[in-house]
Amino acid sequence: MARLAGVDLPPGKRAEIGLTYIYGIGRTRSKSLLHRAGIDFDKKIRDLTEDEINKVRTILEEEGAVEGDLRKEISMNIKRHIEMGSYRGLRHRRSLPVRGQRTHTNARTRKGPRRGTVANKKKATGKT
């Protein structure tokens, strides 16, 4: 089983798809990695030689952050915005959408489940 950036790659998948299991690598970046390493996109992970895996590993190290380093970098950027007191930091702190989306309706994923108001609960119990 091939292991890159601390992630076990699924042996039955094509190399192009298998690399996307690493956080920070999508289809486009996966294709460019394989192209630079000279590996066929349709080759299965189990069929990759140790030399080919090492090529991909060295290219990954050159290109930039993936997996844990990328997660840490993103969380540090969010903390920096919060500490700076910027508008984006305020939106992160309040768990609201950061990039200008409407919140009067929608934004349920970011805001979480609906919280009913106390006044509505009193009215509902008083009518029975």
Curated annotation (Swiss-Prot):
Coiled coil: none annotated. It comes from the Bacteria. Keywords: Ribonucleoprotein, Ribosomal protein, RNA-binding, rRNA-binding, tRNA-binding. One of its GO terms (molecular function) is structural constituent of ribosome. GO terms for cellular component: cytosol; small ribosomal subunit. GO terms for biological process: translation. Gene3D superfamilies: 1.10.8.50, 30s ribosomal protein s13, domain 2. Residues 89-128 have a biased composition (Basic residues). Pfam families: Ribosomal_S13. Belongs to the universal ribosomal protein uS13 family. Located at the top of the head of the 30S subunit, it contacts several helices of the 16S rRNA. In the 70S ribosome it contacts the 23S rRNA (bridge B1a) and protein L5 of the 50S subunit (bridge B1b), connecting the 2 subunits; these bridges are implicated in subunit movement. Contacts the tRNAs in the A and P-sites. PANTHER family: 30S RIBOSOMAL PROTEIN S13/40S RIBOSOMAL PROTEIN S18, SMALL RIBOSOMAL SUBUNIT PROTEIN US13M. Part of the 30S ribosomal subunit. Forms a loose heterodimer with protein S19. Forms two bridges to the 50S subunit in the 70S ribosome. This is Small ribosomal subunit protein uS13. The gene is rpsM.
